[in-house]
């Protein structure tokens, strides 16, 4: 529709070893020269379109090549943004690596395709992509970053455990509550993403 190829969606390439993703059609001609540059930068991506109304441009990101660097990546988020990843298990680390890699993909695309006068907004949904937003805030601060959460980590944890959510909200200490429910790292990333968003 209205945005044509200026609205680009990014998702994880979860079908990379199986049959083709039925929701995605790769397009070898779309951003062809940038894809070559991205590959030279160590980014493994597929570019094409989602098979939904409007067929928006989509980039699928294979983040697995960054798994060996996870400790350095998590350390950098602590040093730059004080994101506490110490208690994060694989259900935390995997989304952090996806978000980080998505941020690197956006950085590569912007540096290759976008003039300094063009305005770019990158929107990140949920804590699972917050690392991408934080990466961009450091690497390309000129990109406007929006962070959207549809339900917070703590809100889900509180409600999911049958506790009252809205009336006693002021009584919940975020750090203590996150620790109580074992979501310290997720809550830390989410709160830092919200803090650093534009």
Question: What are these regions, as identified by a protein language model?
Answer:
Residues 1-198:
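Catalytic cores of nucleotide-sugar-dependent glycosyltransferases that transfer UDP/GDP/TDP-activated
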